[in-house]
Amino acid sequence: DSLDETTDYSPDNPVSVKIGVTGTDTPQWDFIADIAAEEGIEIEIVRFNDYVQPNQALADGEIDANAFQTISYFDHFIEEHDLDLTAIGSTVLAPMGLYSTKYDSVDDIPDGAEITIDKEATNQARNLMLLQEAGLLELEDDFGVTSGVDQIKNNPKNIKLTEIVAGNAPRLMEDVDAALINNGIAVDAGLVPPEDAIALESETATPYINIIAARSEDADNPVLQRIVDIYQSDEVKTFIEEEYAGATIPTYISLDELNSYPR
Amino acid sequence: MLEWLPEAIRPNITSELLLESLYETVYMVGWSLLFSGVIGILLGVTLVVTRPGHILENSFVFHTLNPIINVLRSVPFIILLVALIPFTRFLMGSAIGTTAAIVPLVFYAGPYIARLIENSLLEVEPGIIEAADAMGASKAQIIFRFILPEALSSLLLSLTTATIGLVGATAMAGAIGAGGIGDVAITYGYQRFDNGTMLITVLLLIVIVQGLQSLGNISSKRVRRR
Amino acid sequence: MLEWLPEAIRPNITSELLLESLYETVYMVGWSLLFSGVIGILLGVTLVVTRPGHILENSFVFHTLNPIINVLRSVPFIILLVALIPFTRFLMGSAIGTTAAIVPLVFYAGPYIARLIENSLLEVEPGIIEAADAMGASKAQIIFRFILPEALSSLLLSLTTATIGLVGATAMAGAIGAGGIGDVAITYGYQRFDNGTMLITVLLLIVIVQGLQSLGNISSKRVRRR
Amino acid sequence: MIEFKQVTKTFHSGNQTVTALDNVNLHVARGEIYGVIGFSGAGKSTLIRSANLLERPTSGEVLINGVNLATLKSRELQKAKRNIGMIFQHFNLLQSKTVFDNVATPLKLTRTPKADIRKRVTELLSFVGLSDKADNYPEQLSGGQKQRIGIARALATNPEVLLCDEATSALDPDTTSSILHLLKKINIEYNITILMITHEMSVIREICDKVAVMEKGRIIEEGSVLSIFSNPQHPTTEKFVRSIIPTGLPARVKEALQQKEPNRRIYEVTVTGDSSHSDLLRSLIQTFGIEVDILHATMNDIQGTSFGRIYFDLRAEPEILAEASNYLKSHPLQPKEVTGDARVAA
Amino acid sequence: MIEFKQVTKTFHSGNQTVTALDNVNLHVARGEIYGVIGFSGAGKSTLIRSANLLERPTSGEVLINGVNLATLKSRELQKAKRNIGMIFQHFNLLQSKTVFDNVATPLKLTRTPKADIRKRVTELLSFVGLSDKADNYPEQLSGGQKQRIGIARALATNPEVLLCDEATSALDPDTTSSILHLLKKINIEYNITILMITHEMSVIREICDKVAVMEKGRIIEEGSVLSIFSNPQHPTTEKFVRSIIPTGLPARVKEALQQKEPNRRIYEVTVTGDSSHSDLLRSLIQTFGIEVDILHATMNDIQGTSFGRIYFDLRAEPEILAEASNYLKSHPLQPKEVTGDARVAA
Ligand SMILES: Nc1ncnc2c1ncn2[C@@H]1O[C@H](COP(=O)(O)OP(=O)(O)OP(=O)(O)O)[C@@H](O)[C@H]1O
Ligand SMILES: Nc1ncnc2c1ncn2[C@@H]1O[C@H](COP(=O)(O)OP(=O)(O)OP(=O)(O)O)[C@@H](O)[C@H]1O
Ligand SMILES: [Mg+2]
Ligand SMILES: [Mg+2]
């Protein structure tokens, strides 16, 4: 399982690493893999279509690292499942926004309005927190990263929350009063987050910064460290900025900073 | 309602949510079964009777319908869901929610049922159709008074299989906010690691499927004459 | 390879990815069809021959198997996928990837095929089984030399329907990193709003499904004797 | 009424071609009961099935009431077919319907009022002796019972034309005879035209007016039942006629011949119509003083006249027998001496 | 060989109960050809189907070779069944297999070498006259052809016991007769035991040694074919016997009676076995001087002896006829005068 014995590598004696990603994060990983390959690190990308399996597979040793989740989701997951995993580097931040085809500001949202939220648990928690930030809801004090609609304390406007799959939000916007949409998806769908959103997650929302995770025993593995370095290089930063047109913001902060978000 | 369960398997969801999702599943399966059943039977019958050598042989209809059904059966459900959004909105007023889900479910199950029905109808003894023809039965009479009743037992099993398939598909209809037990199982049970919810929802699904299958088996057996 | 397409529908994915995913789909469908076909036929045959009044009447087997199949058919695919992880890992050495996906796909398609086969086999004329019995055929001979050949035409159509169902299910196997065209359609096309990818992948799926259905129809027709 | 004009039907299977009907011409007049007989595989079913277009002829045409059904529009064709009842060789009953509903089916197709249906079906079931099976399903019936349901169903709508493909093949003689009497009765009362396929000469004898003999897709002989029975031309026809009028030597005659007694001779007299044997008997007994016995005789009653053979056993001194043989040679009944070599048992 | 001991079989459908077999006892000895005849629905098929346990009797037992099949283990039962060939009323051919493969099926079950199968099947097909249909599928066959395939299949393994349910019902007389001859031949050559269901008395006459008559699930009469034909006890049996030995007055006799001529009388003589008519004829012609004609005669050849009736037409002055009538009354052949009132046509 461990990568321990493979600290030595060179283009002639390459080491191979399996990295789990989800859905659409492959472009930057393909780019990183090309760079790493020149140094003798052969990255095999394992694409998941789900937010549970990549951590499970990492803990089970089926992959060597994964990069798909926010730090808060990660912390919650390893606690819940008692897994010995560690975050080894920050990657990007894709802030969430509230969009509407009917209203220009949050204040216009009427009583009894219908708003779509993501049915996926961590994103849903983020959605609800953004609605709280926007003053539409009040959440329970112990609201956590996978808390859901049952943790709403107060819903003064009697807003109807409809859970849908994230990718459908832009497509279904016009059927509701407002929709919560991930930046990534919003940009892909042709929205311009700073202009179109009527409420946006703050860009420094530490809990929602994405990370690369590895098994704790491999935390210091030079190969993985090197991959983190490559990810955090300017070259990759530029690539991501161009590729995602601002939807996904490269956010490179120290591990300490990463782990110091309010829980 | 569920507080008496041991903690390890006590679901984190309210019994209201459970009941509501049960209702949503029944609602979606019921309506979409009704429509897709009618459409599926119509398509299935058409596929059978327009094929070469059959009573309404019509090469054009057969060779148009056959690939259309294949196309609908090719598209992954989630994509079908999306592709149909404008149509669903036009038909239902909104593309979101339990009622809206009926449209893609019908598009999903209709062609599927058509294929199952087609297979069942092809097993009807040609002698029966000859007898009908010789009696001067109209094409519609041949279909409704001869072919369908003779295939009824097999049709009921096919519809049972399709209904259970529909129950499975409703779990995916959660993507457009349709709800339902399958969706609760995935979003509350699976994604939130709530074993209690997983257990109870899956148990509910099992009960539903078991009930449907038994109903199908019994009614099919009752009308089976051989 | 795909550069010549007009921009609006030019996919954002490489043709390598497309080819690879095509291979993955074929690989998953092929293997899981093989296993689930064998298992499904076995289960389907067992469901038929152990039912009351049939040649291997066995109330215990029938009344055990029947609900087990229902249970497997009740569980949403994603939950089945998860529930099977330990078993998949034990069997395949790993619970992720294209090869690992075969296990849940077989669990998904096996019981489904069993139901379709059951329906096909129940349509075999009882007179044929009587003739076999009167000839002193063993139970295995009755099944393999009489029931299965007589139902072959319908069986082929059932297997076709199941295979197309499997193609659909592979799209969901993306959850454990299995890849495949359906997955590309969803993650690159659907999630990234890439119409080009959506179009080309769906077209590919249509071609596959159309091909499978034609193959099924033709071979079924060739062995149909009435 | 039913006219086959140069009808040919070929089936293809693999590289084989079967000519089931080979240039068949046949005319069934209104009100006639027309029998078609032939060996298994001769093309009888194909013939009757082409009468109502269940088989489309490869060439030639079939006219019913002067109309070529193949030229009719769908609705007209249905109407025409409702006037043609058909009894199938393999019954073709609906497995999913009760006996009652099977018989009621053709009536339901024409939207007959419920009460009328009940009355008619009850009447038919009682006629075919299956009133107690009204609520049973076909698979619970015996072979003959199924056939009777098929007959009842074909008669339900009082069709003008009835096509019967082996309508009584699964029935015992008693039931057969009552069915045949019914057919004859409706034939007379309603002037219904019946085309009747059978392999049993006794069925032909009992009710048919005319008969055609088929072999290998061709009609090899046809005519009134009387003429065919009394004077079959084709060897196949003769075989069928012989099936009810045996032409082989009876066992008792063969036995007698084997004894080869010099003062005993056996003569065969063919009886056609109203032939009288009184002078023959008187001459032999009184004039020649021969001891005359009737060894065997078989006659058939065909439409009021008798056809058949009598075997006379003559005993006397050889010289008397020789004398008598000259007399017999010139006798109008043309008795033939049977020696055992001339004929072979069938 | 085959023994039915108090076999009862009831079917339930809805609230109806049908007793298809009602306490049936029957013993078929080894090498016998045993015919069972009865009206449609009498229970014949149920009887034969319970011989090889296709129907499990509700009570009673069936022994084959002294063994109650119901007590056998699965494998032994299969072995026993391989020794019992069966021809089904509805053929039960495999639609998915060619004619050749249908006939080959029972041989394949016992893993007969390919070459042997080919030889045997070819032989059987040529015997039933269907060599040219070897590669056809059942649905391409005529009714009689299907039946012949069923026969060939049942004979394929040279079984010791053959159960035939209406084996020739769809066949023309010629084919029937050749099949029956074959059955008789294998019966003699291999000492095969045959239980034969039929509704045709002519089949019984042609090859059966013994016959049982069924009615409403019961065996109402049984015995040697000879005794049943010559001396039927039960009215149903008589009906069957009459189907080939008509007992009604022939048309010609009825016609003669209608003329009511005072100097003419008609006498009926029943022929049983080897009865001689020579002295009767001589007395009438020579002693009384009566003109004697044979009006009608039907005799059946049953296993070497003749059974039947002769109708004599006597013409003379009324006083001579009155005189003769006294003589006839005391004649051992017991001639009966036919007056037209005594008997009713069947
Ligand atoms: N499965 C069944 N359910 C109910 N009744 C049945 C069933 N099978 C047979 N019967 C009845 O049992 C009786 C005897 O049937 P069987 O088939 O033995 O008659 P059969 O003598 O062979 O007549 P046939 O000459 O017409 O073939 C019939 O009245 C029939 O309706
Ligand atoms: N669909 C078919 N394909 C090929 N050959 C066929 C088909 N139908 C009938 N035949 C052949 O045509 C010939 C005539 O068949 P048909 O059924 O008319 O005979 P039939 O006179 O009714 O015989 P039977 O008395 O045995 O019922 C047979 O040789 C048969 O094998
Ligand atoms: Mg025929
Ligand atoms: Mg029977």
From Swiss-Prot, chains D, E:
<dbReference type="GO" id="GO:0005886">
    <property type="term" value="C:plasma membrane"/>
</dbReference>
<protein>
    <recommendedName>
        <fullName>Methionine import ATP-binding protein MetN 1</fullName>
        <ecNumber>7.4.2.11</ecNumber>
    </recommendedName>
</protein>
<keyword id="KW-0472">Membrane</keyword>
<dbReference type="InterPro" id="IPR017871">
    <property type="entry name" value="ABC_transporter-like_CS"/>
</dbReference>
<comment type="subunit">
    <text>The complex is composed of two ATP-binding proteins (MetN), two transmembrane proteins (MetI) and a solute-binding protein (MetQ).</text>
</comment>
<keyword id="KW-0547">Nucleotide-binding</keyword>
<dbReference type="InterPro" id="IPR003593">
    <property type="entry name" value="AAA+_ATPase"/>
</dbReference>
<keyword id="KW-1278">Translocase</keyword>
<dbReference type="GO" id="GO:0016887">
    <property type="term" value="F:ATP hydrolysis activity"/>
</dbReference>
<dbReference type="InterPro" id="IPR003439">
    <property type="entry name" value="ABC_transporter-like_ATP-bd"/>
</dbReference>
<keyword id="KW-1003">Cell membrane</keyword>
<dbReference type="InterPro" id="IPR050086">
    <property type="entry name" value="MetN_ABC_transporter-like"/>
</dbReference>
<keyword id="KW-0067">ATP-binding</keyword>
<dbReference type="GO" id="GO:0005524">
    <property type="term" value="F:ATP binding"/>
</dbReference>
<dbReference type="Pfam" id="PF00005">
    <property type="entry name" value="ABC_tran"/>
</dbReference>
<feature type="domain" description="ABC transporter">
    <location>
        <begin position="2"/>
        <end position="241"/>
    </location>
</feature>
<dbReference type="InterPro" id="IPR027417">
    <property type="entry name" value="P-loop_NTPase"/>
</dbReference>
<keyword id="KW-0029">Amino-acid transport</keyword>
<dbReference type="InterPro" id="IPR041701">
    <property type="entry name" value="MetN_ABC"/>
</dbReference>
<dbReference type="Pfam" id="PF09383">
    <property type="entry name" value="NIL"/>
</dbReference>
<dbReference type="InterPro" id="IPR045865">
    <property type="entry name" value="ACT-like_dom_sf"/>
</dbReference>
<comment type="similarity">
    <text>Belongs to the ABC transporter superfamily. Methionine importer (TC 3.A.1.24) family.</text>
</comment>
<keyword id="KW-0813">Transport</keyword>
<comment type="function">
    <text>Part of the ABC transporter complex MetNIQ involved in methionine import. Responsible for energy coupling to the transport system.</text>
</comment>
<feature type="binding site">
    <location>
        <begin position="38"/>
        <end position="45"/>
    </location>
    <ligand>
        <name>ATP</name>
    </ligand>
</feature>
<dbReference type="InterPro" id="IPR018449">
    <property type="entry name" value="NIL_domain"/>
</dbReference>
<dbReference type="GO" id="GO:0033232">
    <property type="term" value="F:ABC-type D-methionine transporter activity"/>
</dbReference>
